[in-house]
Swiss-Prot record:
Family of the protein in this entry: Belongs to the CinA family.
InterPro entries the UniProt entry points to: CinA, CinA_Arc, MoaB/Mog-like_dom_sf, MoaB/Mog_dom
Organism for this UniProt entry: Metallosphaera sedula (strain ATCC 51363 / DSM 5348 / JCM 9185 / NBRC 15509 / TH2)
Pfam families linked: MoCF_biosynth
SUPFAM superfamilies recorded: Molybdenum cofactor biosynthesis proteins (SSF53218)
Name of the featured protein: Protein Msed_2121
Record-linked HAMAP family: CinA_A
Length: 265
């Protein structure tokens, strides 16, 4: 069974170029390795109506999971929880479990729970907090008509902590889907020459094959060929990838190319 996923990253700094969106790359990689097919990555500003609108739009496509990153902190422009609540037409409520976590973290440091700090415990009605082991603001999750919404902080180490906690929990709830890929390097065959052969193999097998140019198309053709597949049986997935890999390598040889530094023998 194919599980689809979407990623929503929130923050003005992502749209101005001040911050490189490394969170999206990390999340996409982790979801892919878990067998999800990531269909879209969206980046938007810290705007309440925009967050609400995009959440509605994403849910209309019914992905298995949407991971949201950013906007869970104590400042005026941290409005992800409120935006998600608005998009779901739910109330924003004080979550007792999130409040307990915040109280514990601030009291340990001898600090009071100000209104700004209490704000981080306001979650959409029905949401379950995810403990943030790397920082303060808790993440949260809720399921809407079969779609898991997972909200994580924007600070990379905190996003990773919250996301990994959720994914580890998810493994106990859903049958695993395995992702596997291998790649090898090709010299002496232009991408445009190899393209029709790749297209035919993809159409026949359903396996993902991608060529990544590393040299000049005509004067110095040099390609990385990536082959990837997902499925519920890990041994079968590897077998399919390796079988297709051998077919592509045979085509490369027929076209007069050479194989260089196989990365995943």
């Amino acid at each position: 069974m194919l599980y689809t996923a979407e990623i929503l990253t929130i923050g003005n700094e992502l749209l101005t170029g001040r911050t490189v969106n490394t969170n999206a790359s990390y999340i996409a990689s982790r979801l892919t390795l878990m067998g999800f097919s990531v269909r879209r990555i969206t980046a938007i500003r810290d705007e309440l109506e925009e967050i609400a609108s995009v959440i509605k739009e994403i849910l209309g496509r019914s992905p298995a999971i949407v991971v949201v990153s950013g906007g869970l902190g104590p400042t005026y422009d941290d409005m992800t929880a409120e935006g998600i609540a608005k998009g779901l037409d739910r109330k924003l409520v004080m979550n007792e479990d999130a409040l307990r976590e915040l109280r514990e973290k601030y009291q340990t440091r001898g600090l009071p729970l100000t209104q700004e700090r209490l704000k981080m415990a306001l979650l959409p009605e029905g949401a379950k907090p995810i403990r943030n082991e790397a920082g303060i603001a808790p993440g949260f999750t809720l399921n809407v008509n079969g779609t898991d919404i997972v909200a994580t902080p924007g600070v990379p180490r905190e996003m990773e902590s919250v996301l990994e906690s959720f994914l580890n929990h998810m493994l106990t709830r859903r049958p695993p889907v395995y992702y596997y890929e291998e790649s090898f390097l090709v010299r002496g065959v232009m991408e445009s020459t190899l393209a029709p052969h790749i297209k035919g193999i993809v159409k026949e097998t359903g396996v993902y094959i991608k060529t990544h140019p590393k040299g000049h198309e005509t004067s110095e053709p040099y390609l990385e060929v990536q082959i990837a597949y997902s499925g519920e049986n890990p041994d079968r997935v590897k077998e399919i990838v390796r079988s297709v890999k051998e077919r592509v390598k045979a085509v490369v040889r027929e076209l007069g190319g050479t194989l260089d530094r196989v990365q995943n023998p």
